Amino acid sequence: RLGKAAVIWRFDPLVLSDDITIDDLVEKIRRIGSQIHEYTEKLVFSFADIMSYKRVRLNLERNNIPYHEWEESQMEEVAERISRLNTDEGWGLQLATCSENIDLERHGITHNRCIDGDLIVRLAWRDKALMNFMGVTISKGGPVAGDMFDNDAIALTDGHFFYSVHKKDQGQRKACLCMAAKDIGEYNTCPHMCEYCYANTSKQAALANWKMHNYNPKGETITGK
């Protein structure tokens, strides 16, 4: 079993428009959270930055979606309401934002590492090949997390511990805290057709690739090639 720690709930991005208000977004989060909070430990969200992504802007304009850019006061309101939901509904989730500059620590919301080396070690520290690849040394005995003599040690199970070797991926945005990794995805492959999506340049291409995948679902690539 993967366990709750391996399942990250993402509500990403939060999009505002003439038809989608902050109340609508918070209610959607409440409804989803009430059903899945027992199966995850973390909720990660972000605020749609439309003008920074030409493809996204064109997608929305092409489909006549009257989007709004987020103002800082609106971000603060959403953060406060999500934090209150997390407490009032008894979810007890870790809350974090993805690639956001705004500081929401006052609401108990941190900046996330969506590809998190420390989490990977926590989940797969018994995989020696993976640990060697990441440059992580797993030790046993001695210092533990919270030890007054070694606050940098991160505790695992069975008395094991490690020291973080998380290194930011320099190829990502400044606000992105992900570790260096290789993307194995492929553009124009999702058939859900979300109007916001930055990964589909063409609905026709996405549907064509989806059909190719269905012809050869066990192919070496997602498109079955």
Predicted features, each with a name:
Residues 203, 207, 214-225:
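Short Fe-S-cluster ligation motifs
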Residues 72-174:
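A C-terminal junction/extension of Radical SAM enzymes
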Residues 1-81:
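Conserved AdoMet/S-adenosylmethionine-binding subsite of the radical SAM
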